[in-house]
Curated annotation (Swiss-Prot):
PANTHER family: 30S RIBOSOMAL PROTEIN S14 (PTHR19836), SMALL RIBOSOMAL SUBUNIT PROTEIN US14M (PTHR19836:SF19). The lineage of its organism: Bacteria, Bacillati, Mycoplasmatota, Mycoplasmoidales, Mycoplasmoidaceae. Keywords: Metal-binding, Ribonucleoprotein, Ribosomal protein, RNA-binding, rRNA-binding, Zinc. The keyword Thylakoid does not apply. GO terms for biological process: translation. This is Small ribosomal subunit protein uS14.
Length: 61
């Protein structure tokens, strides 16, 4: 789990736009964030298995 201070710091609008970075909206993880959904791969996997993300299903080929 991410530090509360870093989550709050990231939510503020940065002075320069290059300082902005993606962070998971659900758990606050800074790495492996899927931009389209705004959540990290771990949260994405969890929600996909539960069927909470419409149109996403497990791949099989």
């Amino acid at each position: 789990m991410a530090k509360k201070s870093l989550i709050v710091k990231q939510k503020k609008h940065p002075k320069f736009k290059v300082r902005a970075y993606t962070r998971c909206e659900r758990c606050g993880r800074p790495r492996a964030v899927i931009r389209k959904f705004g959540i990290c791969r771990l949260c994405f996997r969890d929600l996909a298995y539960k069927g909470a993300i419409p149109g996403v299903k497990k791949a099989s080929w």
